[in-house]
Each structure stands twice: as structure tokens, then as C-alpha cells.
Amino acid sequence: MLNRYRSFGYVRNQRGSQIVEYVFVFPLLWFLFIYGCDQFSIMYQKQKALAASYEAGRFACVQPNYGLAVYMANKFAEKELEQALHFEHKQIELIVKGGWSQGNHVEARVSITFPLLGSGKSYTVEESYSMMIENGRNRG
């Protein structure tokens, strides 16, 4: 019977164990929080880059010439990128396959470079969207 109460005495003397657990577990929880924030920012920026490339391609493919298509693509992609998180650099480009005429394809590419929260390193996300040119005018 006396041995049984000795084990309870051991449990009562564990007053400092919570602070030790806190010291060892808190950095792990902090790491998980920072990792989650980094993953969220990467996925959110990827979604915004895809939305911007979609808007750029959608408005570019209905323009009658390449110059107007580039202007409209930049205008609407930048409008979509206003909703993105803080970024260091953005690049919007149109790649035409086979000249600006009806039936050919245009690819809108958007890349965003932004800092990660945990490490501070720059991370680049690139998305593209390809569409058929609908309103291109043939010369001649």
C-alpha cells in the first residue's frame, strides 16, 4: 500500500514539466504556422497569376491587331493583379503562334515574384493561358 502512494508523489512533483513542454513544443507550432502562411501565399499568388493570365488572354484574343491586344492584355491583367498580395516584380507577356490572324493561338503568360514570410526568399509563380484568336484581321 505504501508503494502505491509513492507513485502519486512522483506525479505531484511534476510542476515544471509544463514549461519544458512549452519550450520544446512552441517552436514546432510556430514553424507549422509560418509554413502554413507560406503555403497559403504561394497558392493565393498562383491563383491570382492564373486569373490574370486568363483575363489577359480573354481580352487579347478578341482584338483586331497585336498592338491593341498587348495593351488590353496588360490593362486587364494588371487590374486582376491589384488583388494579389505584396509582390516585388510582375511580368505580363503575349506569345502569338503563327501571326495575328483569326484561327491562330495566343498564349498569355503572367509571372509574379514575391517574398516568402518564413525565409524572406523570393519565390516566382508563373501561369499561362492559351486561347484562339477570334477577331484577328488578315492584311491584304
Please place each PLM-identified region on the residue numbering.
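Low-complexity, S/T/G/P-rich flexible repeat/linker segments used as non-globular hinges
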Residues: 2-3, 109-140
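General N-terminal targeting signals
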Residues: 36, 76, 123-125
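Alpha-helical assembly-interface signal, strongest on the long, hydrophobic N-terminal helix that forms
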Residues: 2-74
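Short amphipathic secondary-structure patches
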Residues: 55-111, 139-140
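Residues embedded in well-ordered secondary-structure elements
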Residues: 38, 97-99, 118
